[in-house]
A protein has these predicted regions:
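Conserved donor-nucleotide/metal-binding helix-loop-beta segment in metal-dependent transferases, i.e.
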Residues: 119-144
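Catalytic-core segments of class I nucleotidyltransferases/pyrophosphorylases
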Residues: 157-210
Length: 210
């Protein structure tokens, strides 16, 4: 059986200001090493199950420091720079040039999710054989702060509403977005080209590709 060709975009440009630390968020330590290292090790462990094409890490805050730490411990990692913090869709677009000649599918995830499981990534890859765009979701008793997932009558994801944009009814929804997606590379950037810049919030939401 032919292995799926998969690339990864890891979003790691944020400052992590809520941590009240000068250390870049993805370099905070968990079990003795930076949290992004845990993600990279899990991705690399998939190489016997998939054709791993590219790993791209989108950097912003303290980019040289993050790049140095990662490059000292891992080889073959690509880096893209998000110069201005214009949201998650803008961050993914920063990686476009590095994937322009790459075929296959891409998983997009955040660099502060060290507990992501190998099983979840494999489940997404399996899901992508039957859908154009796959989104990982979860249910929680306390959905505050997460994007709410709206389903259609066929129980498919219809849209994702960010917490700050949700009305009272939408805020009661307990099905939430993990921020992990899978799509064909060319389709992802086609969808991103349709995402509009929100001039009031100075952001482009990745959730708008749904």
């Amino acid at each position: 059986m032919q292995k799926e060709s998969i690339s990864f975009i890891i979003l790691a440009a944020g400052k992590g200001s809520r941590m009240r630390s000068n250390t870049p968020k993805v370099l905070h330590s968990l079990a003795g090493e930076p949290i992004i290292f845990h993600i990279l090790r899990k991705i690399l462990s998939l190489s016997n199950k998939i054709t791993l094409k590219k790993i791209i890490i989108v950097l912003g805050h303290e980019s040289e420091l993050v790049k140095k730490d990662i490059s000292s411990n891992f080889s073959g990692i690509n880096f893209a720079i998000q110069d201005k913090q214009y949201g998650t869709a803008h961050a993914v677009l920063s990686a476009k040039d590095l994937l322009i000649n790459t075929r296959g599918k891409v998983i997009v995830l955040c660099g502060d999710t060290p507990l992501i499981s190998i099983k979840l990534m494999l489940d997404l890859i399996k899901l992508s054989k039957n859908v154009d765009l796959g989104v990982s979701v979860f249910k929680t008793l306390n959905p505050f702060g997460y994007g709410r997932v709206i389903l259609n009558k066929l129980n498919k994801v219809f849209s994702i509403i960010e917490e700050k944009d949700a009305n009272k009814s939408q805020k009661s929804i307990n099905l939430c977005n993990t921020g992990i997606y899978i799509s064909d590379i060319s389709l992802l950037f086609k969808l991103l080209s349709l995402v509009k810049f929100n001039s009031n919030k100075k952001e482009m939401y990745l959730t708008d590709i749904v």
